[in-house]
Amino acid sequence: MENKKFEEKPSEGRRNFLQAGGMALLGLAMPEAISAKPRAAESLAMSGGPKAVHFPADKLEALTRWPRYGQAEKDALHRLIDTDMFYEELPLFEKEWQAYTGIPYLRAHINGSSAITSMLFAIDLEPGSEIMVPSYDFPTDVLAMRFFSYVPIFIDISPTTGTFDLEDARRKMTSRTRAVFPMHSWGMPCDMDHIRDFAKEKDLIVLEDAAHAHGASMQGKKMGTWGDLAIFSFQASKVLPTVEGGMGMYH
């Protein structure tokens, strides 16, 4: 009897059957994939395409304008100019900020960067000491360290809050680490209770960047009062703007 070889390719009838069966199964699992019509490509609005949101430009500018000053602020500025006593208001501001935060020692600065530099000077660490900072941070927190030969250790940020990730800090702790320097991104408080516990356990100084966190609090305790030292900024983009200014705070 003559031996016949099997065909390596399925017959046309079998191929059509398999294709039809596969499409039927795909249709059961993903009916929208079969029934959906292809969408026409659209250009982005910036490239001349249709806008997804329509909002009057004048209203948008009014809503997003910052900083905002009212008549009270304008009157206070006029009084300052008329009296020609430019520096008399500063001690009053320090006194009011001290009463608001409950911090015993503080000093106003020309800006937040100056307050940060003063804070890093005050801790008086040895050159080469490591300070943990979030990887998403304002440059001054790191740049000011170079004045004192401190070494920044960049800590990952939490994907849910955008703030200092304590678990990553635990992994990157070394024998040279001397301080942690968390920042409250966009005013979102870091987990300062856990950070303080970690710092106490490892004998670390807590430096708190509260530049964005005016008025924010956690567990009834204001941000800027959790650290051994802390700073605020009053730059024009901040929650409490004075065009420029900063505050250094010390327990």
Language model regions located:
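PLP-dependent aminotransferase-like
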Residues: A45, F121-A210, S217
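Phosphate-binding glycine-rich loop
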Residues: E89-E130, A144, F154, K221
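Conserved active-site segment immediately N-terminal to the catalytic lysine
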Residues: E208-T242, M247
